[in-house]
Amino acid sequence: LKLNQSMPNFAVYLFSGLVLINLFNEAFSNSTKAVVDNSALVKKVYLPRELFPVASSIIAVVNFLPQLIVLLVVCGFLGWHPSFVQVLCIVLGVLIIVILSLGLGLLFGAINVALRDAQNIVDMILLFSTWLSPILYNVKLVEEALGPIGLVIYNLNPVTGAVGLLHYGVWAPTTAQTPEIMALMGSDVLRFGLIALMVSLILLVIGQLVFSRLEKSFAQNL
């Protein structure tokens, strides 16, 4: 695609997306396996079972923070000059990923106790997560390929919304932020970011409800 020839600071664009998708992949995968991996504790010690996927998500965030710090230090050398709103977008993008991965982790983690094949579904989702978000390419290319309606559907992916927010907060302030450059991220980054937050919260509620319903049978299934 030769994106490095059409986008300023493409390395920042790429890395800012990768660190966020790595957070999602690690938190989602580990949360899904958390109950099964701690089966001895689940069967012998009474603890809130949600503790295991939550702890897995916290560990993923701890692993993510040094990567984010390195990224921001590099951006500082490239003239990073974010506005207050752009800084908030970084926080919101990370928050969306944490909420989303925890919600999905609770959902698939509960199912995985009874049906171990659920982990294979998660692995399939993670396999495509990088390609279904604007990390290796920009949103303008998606619009050209899918058209306006296809772009809207594409942007409804909450991971896409979160990555867009991080690009807006991290990558955009290292550029001149001209209309042509900002168009590479799409014109509705903030709106789709808020939609991503709502979708993630809904999935968190669904995940918690399913987890609470199935946890009564955890001990016998493990």
Report the location of each language-model feature.
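Alpha-helical transmembrane segments and their short interhelical loops
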Residues: 1-3, 49, 55-125, 129, ...
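Membrane-proximal juxtamembrane linkers immediately C-terminal to transmembrane helices
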Residues: 4-9, 220-222
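Hydrophobic alpha-helical transmembrane segments of multi-pass membrane transport proteins
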Residues: 7-77
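Intracellular alpha-helical coupling/juxtamembrane segments of multi-pass membrane proteins
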Residues: 28-48, 58, 114-128, 135, ...
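A cytosolic-side transmembrane-helix exit/cap motif
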Residues: 29-35, 107-112, 140-145
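Short hydrophobic, aromatic-rich alpha-helical segments embedded in or entering the lipid bilayer
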Residues: 133-185, 189
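Short cytosolic juxtamembrane segments of multi-pass membrane proteins
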Residues: 212-222
